[in-house]
């Protein structure tokens, strides 16, 4: 199982998510890196940045309050990017955004994907961050984004997205999946968990994104 980061923040019950990650690692072979959301938490242990409820950082503050010492210790063990070699298959390079930029967004930044693939010394690049499922090839290299389980940007909404990679004849063949799930139950958890009291406007953007598949959260952040 390959995981590309952004495991918690901006959602209810982050401690439950962490427990599921620990269980997954016990039961399966996992290759994991961390994303920008984990960076935010690691950089603010003890709330050095002064995050507050009912502010632009409210949901981050909520998550920070629910993190345990073992969660921070676990995040510290995860690299921001790494290569992955599986016998008989081409080398994969894993990153959250782009190599060297955990917040590099090939879906929003014009020309970034082309630049990254041109310079990439690996045949395959797996990236996340944009939450947008896609595959593209150029310069003899391939970029794959499996999408997002918890916050898919697909202009449809109410789906969890991921990809299955199959090694075939010295190449990787991805199958992209988009699975409907109980979004209404998830939305109720925002209220039941208390996170809605922390996030305010951003939480409304997140919940609208979950229903529509449009990244209102990203555009809300840009507007702040």
Language model segments and positions:
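Acidic, His/Gly-rich catalytic cores of divalent-metal-dependent hydrolytic chemistry
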Residues: 138-224
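Active-site-proximal segments of metal-dependent phosphoesterases and phosphodiesterases across multiple
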Residues: 50-54, 88-120
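Conserved hydrophobic/aromatic beta-strand scaffold that supports enzyme active sites
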Residues: 81-83, 94, 135, 162-164
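Active-site environment of divalent metal-dependent phosphoester hydrolases
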Residues: 9-12, 37-42, 100, 126-137, ...
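Anionic-ligand binding region
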Residues: 110-149, 160
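Metallo-beta-lactamase
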Residues: 55-91
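Core catalytic region of metal-dependent phosphoesterases/phosphodiesterases
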Residues: 1-69
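Active-site neighborhood of phospho(di)ester-bond hydrolases with catalytic His/Asp-centered motifs
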Residues: 1-6, 31-36, 94-95, 124-131, ...
């Amino acid at each position: 199982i390959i995981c590309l980061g952004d495991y918690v923040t901006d959602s209810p019950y982050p401690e439950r998510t962490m427990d599921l990650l620990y269980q997954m690692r016990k039961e399966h072979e996992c290759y994991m890196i961390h994303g920008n959301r984990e960076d935010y938490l690691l950089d603010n242990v003890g709330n050095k940045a002064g995050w507050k409820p009912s502010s632009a950082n409210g949901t981050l503050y909520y998550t920070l309050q629910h993190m345990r010492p073992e969660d921070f210790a676990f995040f510290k063990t995860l690299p921001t990017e790494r290569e992955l070699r599986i016998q008989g298959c081409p080398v994969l390079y894993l990153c959250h955004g782009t190599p060297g930029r955990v917040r590099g967004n090939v879906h929003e930044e014009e020309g970034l994907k082309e630049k990254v693939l041109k310079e990439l010394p690996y045949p395959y690049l797996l990236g996340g961050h944009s939450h947008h499922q896609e595959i593209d090839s150029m310069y003899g290299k391939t970029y794959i984004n499996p999408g997002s389980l918890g916050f898919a940007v697909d202009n449809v909404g109410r789906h969890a997205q991921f990809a299955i990679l199959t090694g075939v004849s010295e190449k990787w063949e991805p199958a992209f999946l988009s699975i409907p799930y109980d979004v209404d139950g998830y939305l109720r958890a925002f209220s039941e968990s208390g996170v809605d009291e922390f996030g305010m406007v951003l939480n409304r953007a997140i919940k609208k994104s979950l229903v529509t598949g449009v990244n209102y959260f990203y555009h809300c952040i840009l507007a702040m």
